[in-house]
C-alpha cells in the first residue's frame, strides 16, 4: 500500500535536499576560495598568517542560506503555478519560466540557450 505524504512531509524532504545541496556548494566554493588564497601567498611567513585567513562558513550562515534558497524556490514555484493557471494550463511550460525571469534578460537568454540544446 502506497502511503500518501502530507504537505509538511514533502516540504521537510525538499528542505533537507536543499540543505544538502547548499552545504555541498558552500563547501566547494570555500575550498576553491581558500585554495586561491593559498596560491597567492608566496612566502612562508605569509603562509603562517594565511591559516588565520581561511574562510569558513558557520552552521548559522548555512542554515540562513538554506532558508533563503528554500523561500526563493517556494516563490518560484508559486509564480510558475500562477503563470500556468493564467494560461489555462495544468502543466508548467518553458514560457512560464521565461515570464518569471523576464526582468533578468541574461538569465532568460541562458535558459533559452539551454532549451535549444
Swiss-Prot record:
The keyword DNA-binding belongs to this UniProt entry's keyword annotation: yes
Signal peptide positions (record): none
Keywords: DNA damage, DNA repair, DNA-binding
Lineage top rank: taxon: Eukaryota
GO BP term, pick one: resolution of meiotic recombination intermediates
Recorded GO MF terms: chromatin binding; DNA binding; protein heterodimerization activity
GO cellular component, one term: FANCM-MHF complex
Pfam family, one: CENP-S
InterPro entries hit by this protein: CENP-S/Mhf1 (IPR029003), Histone-fold (IPR009072)
Assembly notes: The MHF histone-fold complex is a heterotetramer of 2 MHF1-MHF2 heterodimers. Together with MPH1/FANCM, forms the FANCM-MHF complex. Component of the inner kinetochore constitutive centromere-associated network (CCAN).
Family: Belongs to the TAF9 family. CENP-S/MHF1 subfamily.
Function, as annotated: dsDNA-binding component of a FANCM-MHF complex involved in DNA damage repair and genome maintenance. FANCM-MHF promotes gene conversion at blocked replication forks, probably by reversal of the stalled fork. Component of the kinetochore, a multiprotein complex that assembles on centromeric DNA and attaches chromosomes to spindle microtubules, mediating chromosome segregation and sister chromatid segregation during meiosis and mitosis. Component of the inner kinetochore constitutive centromere-associated network (CCAN), which serves as a structural platform for outer kinetochore assembly.
Protein name: Inner kinetochore subunit MHF1
Organism whose genome encodes this protein: Candida albicans (strain SC5314 / ATCC MYA-2876) (Yeast)
Underlying gene: MHF1
